[in-house]
């Protein structure tokens, strides 16, 4: 039978150079190559884009207007292509309502399970509550031993204050003779005088019966009479001290608390029928925090301790806020020059929360010298800022205030997102929120062993089977430490991608082309086998799985490897080698093959640095950290390792980075929970080199971020042409009026709105996409205008500015981190996370350092080929050579083996992690029998 292929001919998207390639269908194919070589251009911008476009074209024009139309990629022909699904890292849902449970759809099945077989309990007292029909009540009472005496009461008042005169009169007129009030029997004919301010319980005696055959009709009539009197509640007194309370609705027969009819929507925090009415299902509230408003309590009020807009000028004697603080100090007898931390607790409370109903006398002279005396109630800093926030309509001003807010759990639901009634329903003795907070491995065990009655099992069988299958897929991709309640916005790119991968396997689609972008990111070597097995399973279902990947194990297990290169940018865009791992290893032109065969390798450092000073963290308890004490060496290169979810990010990002940024950089951050930190005096600043974009708009680019554009504009402004025309540096900015093209406001492109098609961006007709007006472009330096320079690659700019050391140094560092191929004016929106991170790294390397900086990097090898990793390690070593402290969270063993010191966390993820397993040099950790990292590291050190 003829093998089916996806045939690509003449692919020219981005830097691809007329690529012709045949990819076998229903296979696991890895696309690899240097960063910027064209892998993503081939996988996402060509194969996926064309597969998606063809599917879209099959839809009606009406449907297309809602879905959007994808542009046809620059390719001559693609044959044998299936509908394509892209699972990348950029499409993580940041909606606060989105959780792991909702993304995987497990929560939808859980809602159905709880609605169908959940046992409701009273939200107040916790008693199990059941609703029963009149017939069920009769049958229950008739099962009592013959001769059993009983009294039927209607509880008409339960624990309410008042004299209840009208109610008692109404009951008497209805023909009832006796009632039990607060436990005592009364004849309704007698005068009953109840204490108005006490709580009372009134139960009307409806009937007295003895259990025997033939009383069913009378019992039924009496029960119906009771239920009509008491809104569905029946109290049976058996005259021996035993009482039975029954209800026709989900209401507690003891205290009367009721819950609504149980439906799947009762457990949805995105539906008003289930959502907590206080936080509307978000689970938290944003509240102003005094710690963020007064970040440095060692300052006095006169020194500007308050950093809130409108209060920052409180040290200015002409401001009204200063006049109020003076009035406060006079009334309560404290000095505005005393450090805030030394003020008495009572005074600090008044400053933050106000004087209550007490007035103060404020003497205020306006800028025109007119003096006024006011009697005002001081509302307090927190109340003042909250009021101004609520009254303000400007989005920019709101964002300004929001930096002083922190997230706190909702006071009503405590983060559970649901109404009390919904949270009182249990399955297997757990509420839906309790089951969702279990780590997925524990959740899977719980749902697999939950005890149900025979009837409940019949109802829930299909639901539980679906939940078990989907949670098992999550375990198969190494996400055992996550919980279903985890907010989707807090997931890393790799975690989000593996969740979507598990969801796709759960969907059971066949005949699809899956395009994945480095699914192994953030995954420990221990869990890599599970991920590879998952990819193979997706393939075995009958799908084509095309993975952009740099992981060695994935390459060795792939059916086919396509090596794109040979270099990056203009030097890439070609297929260097195609074949199995063994075939690639024999190819002399393939850098990937040379690394796989061991001909090329990232060398171990000749000598590991030693240290004398440490940054000491005590009592770290953020997330799953278990009261951790750890010493982080200073002036060396340290890697924090451990399985996914072991607590690395909680320690490094939430505690070390945020506390150091707050103290050293005066940043408005609230660190995670820890007891104390020592050793900060050896550092002067902390810099987090993450993978967030270098800018949010196309106006931001590598030239503006690195600061080289300022130097280039200075150079153009000092040219002969510019001086003759009187042009200054500002003339060469595309962000301000003067030199830019005003037709496109310096964007170079113009947006044209289309109705049934996506918006089209076309080059500006006035400047032809060059961003500047004609006069500005006439100014040249060495024959090139400002647009030509922005269009240069880093490599070209290095040659062009050979005699300008300040510019050349910045270009050199960009080349050192493997970014020789990017253009100086390339919009930040076109850069990958890995490229953005390396631009930040290069910017730091080009600065003249103090040698006292703490650099923090979280998985910097994302998107990097073996050769790029080698360059990255060299850069990190250079930072440490300058006396700086480099702290890296990493799973890549080539980086780990080059570190001076390792902090290995674990042993497992989630609740099974959160401790420091071992510390030491890579050699010491490799010999530790309890370290998973050490086990895999061993072969890299030999």
Task: State the predicted function of each range.
Residues 1-942:
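Conserved phosphate-binding elements of NTP-dependent enzyme cores
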């Amino acid at each position: 039978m003829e093998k089916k292929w996806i045939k690509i001919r003449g692919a020219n998207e981005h830097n691809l150079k007329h690529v012709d390639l045949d990819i076998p269908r229903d296979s696991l194919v890895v696309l690899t190559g240097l960063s910027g070589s064209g892998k993503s251009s081939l996988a996402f911008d060509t194969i996926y884009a064309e597969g998606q476009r063809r599917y879209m074209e099959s839809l009606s024009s009406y449907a297309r207007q809602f879905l959007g139309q994808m542009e046809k990629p620059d390719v001559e022909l693609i044959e044998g292509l299936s509908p394509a699904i892209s699972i990348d890292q950029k499409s993580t849902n940041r909606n606060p309502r989105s959780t792991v449970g909702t993304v995987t759809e497990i929560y939808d099945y859980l809602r159905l399970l709880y609605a169908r077989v959940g046992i409701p309990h009273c939200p107040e007292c916790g008693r199990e509550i059941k609703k029963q029909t009149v017939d069920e009540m009769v049958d229950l009472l008739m099962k009592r031993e013959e001769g059993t005496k009983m009294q039927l009461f209607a509880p008409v008042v339960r624990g309410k204050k008042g004299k209840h005169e009208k109610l008692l009169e109404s009951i008497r007129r209805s023909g009832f003779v006796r009632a039990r009030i607060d436990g005592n029997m009364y004849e309704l004919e007698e005068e009953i005088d109840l204490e108005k301010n006490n709580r009372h319980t009134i139960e009307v005696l409806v009937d007295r019966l003895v259990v025997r055959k033939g009383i069913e009709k009378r019992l039924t009539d009496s029960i119906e009479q009771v239920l009509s009197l008491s809104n569905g509640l029946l109290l049976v007194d058996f005259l021996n001290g035993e009482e039975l309370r029954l209800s026709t609705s989900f209401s507690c027969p003891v205290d009367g608390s009721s819950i609504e009819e149980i439906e799947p929507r009762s457990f949805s925090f995105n539906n008003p029928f289930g959502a907590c009415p206080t936080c509307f299902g978000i689970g938290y509230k944003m509240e102003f925090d005094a710690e963020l408003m007064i970040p440095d309590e060692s300052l006095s009020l006169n020194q500007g301790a308050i950093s809130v807009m409108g209060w920052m000028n409180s040290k200015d004697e002409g401001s009204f806020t200063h006049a109020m603080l003076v009035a406060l100090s006079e009334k309560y007898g404290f000095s505005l020059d005393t450090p805030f931390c030394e003020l008495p607790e009572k005074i600090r409370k008044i400053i933050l929360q106000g004087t209550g109903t007490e007035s103060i006398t404020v003497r205020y002279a306006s800028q025109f010298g007119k003096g006024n005396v006011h009697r005002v109630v001081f509302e307090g800093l927190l109340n003042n800022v909250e009021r101004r926030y609520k009254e303000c309509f400007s989005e920019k001003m709101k964002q300004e205030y929001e930096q002083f807010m922190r997230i706190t759990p909702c006071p009503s639901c405590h983060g559970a997102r649901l109404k009390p009634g919904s949270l009182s329903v249990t399955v297997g003795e757990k509420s839906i929120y309790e089951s969702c907070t279990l780590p997925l491995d524990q959740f899977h065990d719980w749902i697999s062993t939950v005890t149900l009655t025979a009837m409940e099992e019949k109802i829930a069988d299909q639901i539980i089977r679906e939940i078990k299958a989907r949670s098992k897929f999550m375990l198969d991709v190494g996400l055992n430490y996550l919980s279903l309640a985890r907010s989707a916005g807090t997931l890393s790119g790799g975690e989000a991608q593996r969740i979507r991968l598990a969801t796709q396997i759960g969907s059971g689609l066949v005949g699809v082309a899956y395009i994945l972008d480095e699914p192994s990111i953030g995954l420990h070597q221990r869990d890599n086998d599970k991920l590879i097995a998952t990819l193979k399973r997706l393939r075995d279902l009958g799908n084509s799985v095309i993975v952009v990947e740099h992981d060695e194990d994935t390459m060795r297990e792939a059916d086919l490897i396509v090596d794109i290169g040979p270099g990056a940018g203009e030097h890439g865009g070609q297929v260097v080698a195609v074949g199995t791992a063994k075939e690639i290893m024999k190819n002399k032109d393939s850098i990937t093959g040379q690394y796989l065969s061991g001909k090329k390798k990232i060398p171990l450092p000749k000598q590991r640095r030693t240290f004398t000073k440490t940054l000491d963290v005590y009592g770290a308890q953020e997330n799953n950290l278990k009261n951790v004490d750890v010493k982080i060496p200073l002036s060396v290169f340290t890697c924090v390792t451990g399985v996914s979810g072991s607590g690395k990010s909680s320690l490094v990002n939430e505690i070390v980075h945020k506390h150091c940024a707050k103290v050293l950089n005066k940043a408005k951050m609230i660190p995670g929970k820890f007891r104390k930190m020592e050793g900060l005096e050896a550092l002067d600043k902390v810099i987090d080199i993450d993978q967030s974009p270098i800018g949010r708009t196309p106006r931001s680019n590598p030239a503006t971020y690195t600061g080289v554009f300022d130097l280039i504009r200075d150079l153009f402004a000092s040219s002969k042409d510019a001086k003759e025309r009187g042009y200054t540096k500002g003339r060469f900015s595309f962000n301000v009026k003067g030199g830019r093209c005003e037709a496109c406001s310096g964007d170079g492109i113009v947006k044209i709105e289309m109705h049934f098609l996506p918006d089209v961006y076309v080059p500006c007709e006035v400047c032809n996409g060059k961003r500047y007006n004609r006069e500005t472009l006439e100014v040249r330096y060495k024959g090139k205008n400002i647009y030509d320079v922005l269009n240069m690659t880093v490599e070209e700019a290095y040659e062009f500015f050979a005699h300008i050391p300040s510019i050349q140094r910045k270009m050199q560092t960009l080349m050192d981190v493997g970014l020789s191929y990017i253009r100086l004016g390339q919009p930040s929106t076109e850069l990958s996370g890995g490229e953005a991170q390396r631009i930040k790294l290069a910017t730091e390397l080009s600065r003249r350092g103090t040698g006292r900086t703490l650099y923090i990097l979280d998985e910097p090898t994302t998107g990097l080929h073996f050769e790029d990793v080698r360059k990255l390690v060299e850069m990190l070593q250079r930072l440490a050579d300058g006396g700086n402290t480099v702290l890296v969270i990493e799973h890549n063993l080539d980086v780990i083996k080059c570190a001076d010191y390792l902090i290995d966390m674990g042993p497992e993820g989630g609740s099974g992690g959160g401790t420091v397993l071992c510390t030491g040099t890579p050699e010491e950790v490799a010999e530790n029998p309890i370290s998973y990292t050490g086990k895999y590291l061993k072969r890299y050190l030999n």
